[in-house]
Amino acid sequence: MAKKGVREKIRLVSSAGTGHFYTTDKNKRNMPGKFEIKKFDPVVRQHVMYKEAKIK
């Protein structure tokens, strides 16, 4: 059986407080810290910061 990969699924939650989120994965070995990126939030129709959260 194949080994489990180093990529972990994460959820990017909008900092605008709209509840909108994106899902993606990241390499835990290359990026051990929390992931932050500016993306488009369709609820407020603006680019806002999205922060990493665990997928429940």
Swiss-Prot record:
Q: Which SUPFAM superfamilies does this entry report, sorted A to Z?
A: Zn-binding ribosomal proteins (SSF57829)
The lineage's top-level taxon is Bacteria
Q: Supply one GO CC term from the record.
A: cytosolic large ribosomal subunit
Q: Does the keyword Chaperone apply?
A: no
Query: In Gene Ontology terms, what is one molecular function of this protein?
Result: structural constituent of ribosome
The protein's UniProt keywords, in alphabetical order, are:
Ribonucleoprotein, Ribosomal protein
Q: Which Pfam families match?
A: Ribosomal_L33
Q: Which Gene3D superfamilies match?
A: Ribosomal protein L33
Keyword Ribosomal protein included in the entry's annotation? yes
The entry's family comment says:
Belongs to the bacterial ribosomal protein bL33 family.
Q: What name does UniProt use for this protein?
A: Large ribosomal subunit protein bL33
| Protein's gene | rpmG
